[in-house]
């Protein structure tokens, strides 16, 4: 809704990383190893990707970050780079709901169609509705990996709520 209303792109570091992984780029291969282990990709890599992305023409009227920044270093780097934000939104969801939602997700790799074993199941269990091909659970959607990522979130990302609430002056969200 927001991207359509303001005619701005949604920028997801996760999507950018998945594209790099699918393309088999050196960054993608490095990122895949880290993500599959439940870790977060290094800040310098993410910040570089984001700076390149927001410099593109379709971002001249603004953009919507999805899942970024994730660390204090990323937030500080964006402030230092002069990237000012109009608003910051935290969606507070209990860990148990996140684990349930993510670990239940199934994907048809060729098309990107996404299902959920409980909330949006395919017509035939484990099969894509259109092609009948197998659905997979991405490694980063496995329960153990999701729990590791949540632990990292609580350690590294929760501090951003305090960071943005205390940010003052021209860089503060309006």
Curated annotation (Swiss-Prot):
> LID: where is this region?
104-141
Q: Which domain of life is it from?
A: Bacteria
Indicate the enzyme's highest-level EC class.
transferase
Q: What's the protein name? A: Adenylate kinase
User: Which Enzyme Commission number(s) are listed?
Assistant: 2.7.4.3
Name the gene that codes for it: adk
Q: What molecular functions are annotated in GO for this chain?
A: adenylate kinase activity; ATP binding
> Which is an annotated Pfam family here?
ADK_lid
Q: Which organism is it from?
A: Neisseria cinerea
GO CC field: cytoplasm
Specify which residues bind AMP according to the UniProt entry for this protein. 13, 18, 39-41, 67-70, 74, 138, 149
Question: Which pathway is it part of?
Answer: Purine metabolism; AMP biosynthesis via salvage pathway; AMP from ADP: step 1/1
Span list, region NMP? 12-41
Instruction: Set out the biological process GO terms recorded for this chain's protein.
Output: AMP salvage
